[in-house]
């Protein structure tokens, strides 16, 4: 099959006709299928073992659990999984890409949708209709620009000073309490449950476009995002924790940022343990030497993740399929 295939849609509404629906993990009991995987092989058995590690994290009352999000699973139908992890006290803090939090979660909180599409669609035709593609998922670019502008409008109303991404996202949560079109977003749920969200590469998203417009309108009195203070804030959470565990979706900046808190604490002269538990769900190949694909065993050589607890490194797509 060729790389592109014209599906003969000729109007925007034809492309944006089938919404992505987010899976509701509270609507069924997955424990039996997960436990049955213990006797299987490959990713199935790894999934069952990862589940055991996560259950250990939850049972460990001294463990601070960090959820990291990278990639586009939020747009693909997994957003409510992460929301419910916050809602049911299964995570204590989140480190994510700006795209996961703003372009996907905040975007839907404003009432917009992601749509089922095709990876074979002619991308020139999509561009002609102002539609963005994430593999087989479509986004209305006009709606995404509303998201950009809304971020700028939120910034316009804040006191002009420096904010960490956590502080700014908290302001977004406050905004959503009265302005959301879709209730129960990850941002709003985290706001309600006092769970901090950090986006170390915050401006690499719709937030960046919105904040650039904000600064253009307010050249002398505007907000800024202080990523250094943000790193210190996250490190302080690690320092104050008796133990910690990582549940990592994808890799990238969020993965490295949370792991580096151990090194930062050491450089500040603090005696902290490495992350005790770690699970990574990814499709990256460790042979390319990239951060996203690096194994958790490799992270132990940097002093980031302890090897005393079994760690699991899983393929993202099969795990979410199960």
Segment roles from a protein language model:
Residues 2-51, 55-58:
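N-terminal glycine-rich anion-binding loop in soluble enzyme alpha/beta folds
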Residues 77-80, 105-111, 208-213, 258-261, ...:
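Short acidic, glycine/serine/threonine-rich loops at helix termini
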Residues 125-207:
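Ligand-binding beta-strand-loop-alpha-helix segment within the catalytic cores
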Residues 65-74, 94, 198-202, 219-291:
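Glycine-rich anion-binding loop/nest that anchors nucleotide
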Residues 81-87, 111, 213-217, 262-269, ...:
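Short, solvent-exposed amphipathic alpha-helical segments in soluble enzyme
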Residues 82-148:
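A generic, well-ordered mixed alpha/beta core segment in the N-terminal half of proteins
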Residues 2-18, 243, 267-322:
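C-terminal functional extensions of proteins
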Residues 51-64, 189-191, 236-243:
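Glycine-rich phosphate/diphosphate-binding loops that line cofactor/substrate pockets in enzymes
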């Amino acid at each position: 099959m060729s790389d592109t295939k014209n599906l003969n849609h000729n109007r925007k509404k034809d492309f944006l006709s089938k919404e992505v629906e987010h899976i509701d993990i509270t609507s069924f009991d997955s424990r039996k299928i997960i436990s049955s995987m213990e006797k299987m092989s490959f990713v199935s058995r790894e999934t069952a073992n990862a589940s055991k590690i996560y259950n250990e994290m939850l049972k460990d009352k001294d463990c601070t659990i960090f959820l990291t999000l990278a990639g586009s699973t939020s747009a693909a139908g997994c957003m409510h999984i992460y929301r419910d992890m916050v809602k049911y006290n299964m995570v204590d803090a989140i480190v994510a890409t700006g795209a996961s939090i703003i372009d996907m979660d905040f975007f839907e909180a404003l009432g917009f949708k992601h749509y089922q599409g095709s990876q074979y669609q002619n991308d020139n035709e999509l561009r002609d209709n102002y539609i963005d593609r994430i593999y087989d998922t479509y986004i209305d670019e006009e709606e995404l620009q509303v998201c950009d502008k809304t971020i700028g409008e939120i910034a316009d109303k804040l006191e002009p000073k420096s904010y960490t991404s956590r502080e700014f996202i908290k302001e977004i949560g406050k905004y959503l309490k009265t302005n959301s079109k879709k209730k129960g977003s990850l941002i709003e749920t985290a706001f309600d449950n006092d769970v901090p969200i950090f986006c170390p590469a915050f401006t690499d998203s719709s937030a960046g476009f919105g904040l650039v417009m904000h600064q253009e309108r307010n050249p002398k009195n505007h907000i800024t995002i202080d990523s250094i203070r943000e790193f210190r804030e996250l490190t302080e959470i690690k320092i104050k924790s008796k133990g910690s565990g990582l549940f990592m979706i994808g890799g990238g900046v969020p993965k490295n940022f949370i792991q580096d808190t151990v090194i930062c604490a050491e450089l500040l002269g603090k005696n902290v343990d490495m992350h005790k538990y770690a699970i990574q769900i990814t499709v990256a190949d460790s042979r390319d030497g990239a951060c996203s694909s690096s194994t958790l065993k490799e992270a132990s050589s940097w002093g980031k993740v302890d090897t005393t607890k079994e760690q699991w490194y899983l393929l993202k797509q099969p795990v979410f399929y199960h």
